[in-house]
Amino acid sequence: MSVRGRIPLGVISFALLSGCASAPTDGSVPSPVPASPTAVNGSFEVGEGRTLHMECSGDGSPTVILEAGDESGVEEWSQVMPEVADLTRTCAYDRAGVGQSDPATGCRGLDDLTGDLDRLLAAADVPGPYVLVAASGGGYIASGFAAEHREEIAGVVFLDVPGPYLDPPPDLVARLTCDASTNIERRDYLAVEHAGWDARAEVGDIPVTVMSVDYGPGASLEAERTNVEVQRGWLVFSPRATQVVMHTGHGIAYEDPQRVIDEIEMVLEATSP
């Protein structure tokens, strides 16, 4: 599958995007320290009597945290995780209600989702610094987590993380409510999307890659341009951020896992002192 060239942050205008914020930072990232080589495959208490399932393998630092797309978990990374674990410690997990993790109750916002990840990393003894690799709706969680833990973020890779719905049709809204029968995460999807988008801010002078899909044959030119252009909003994470335009479907980790592995490896190499 062909890939167009990277688009440097310096040539991108944010005039088309609203709410783009930037926060001051000294650009520092913790010096890598040896991470525990101990493999993890189990469930860990995260409060409220719930457990979340996490798997980690490999050793080294920074640790790669794989954040799956909506209502997906560890299995999304089956073609990516083994090879990335040959490079450094790599962890994936099932969010509440997904896979082997306990369900949550109530309507869940961004703070609930980032809080689960924070508590899970502590319970499983997975220290930073981290490279966050997030697919689709998992990117909003990664955005919120990065905003809360800037000093621990060494790099970011986004896999077709869209901008939030601005005016969704009523039938879609009905499917995205917390109590919808298909909403196994009990996530307030629209609120999480907007909160994750609003959380965008400069994390530091770190390597960031935003992989955006143009949807290829059959998609309207307007749809292609809109998706790619809107996702440039994620480049605010770092002055070193770049965008890669992909000619795949939305599920990049399934359709072109080697490209994902390559991009993660390049980000890891760029974190080296």
Which positions does each model-derived feature cover?
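Catalytic active-site module of serine/aspartate enzymes centered on a nucleophile-bearing elbow/loop
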Residues: R240-P273
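C-terminal motif of bacterial Sec signal peptides marking the signal peptidase cleavage site
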Residues: L16-G19
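Active-site loop/oxyanion-hole signature of alpha/beta-hydrolase fold enzymes
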Residues: A92-V131
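Bacterial signal peptide processing site
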Residues: A21-P24
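Conserved hydrolase catalytic core segment
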Residues: P127-L166
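Conserved HGGG/HGGXW glycine-rich cap/lid loop of the alpha/beta-hydrolase fold
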Residues: V46-Q100
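Flexible "cap/lid" loop of the alpha/beta hydrolase fold
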Residues: V157-R187, E229
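Conserved loop-alpha-helix segment in the C-terminal half of the alpha/beta-hydrolase fold
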Residues: P217-H247
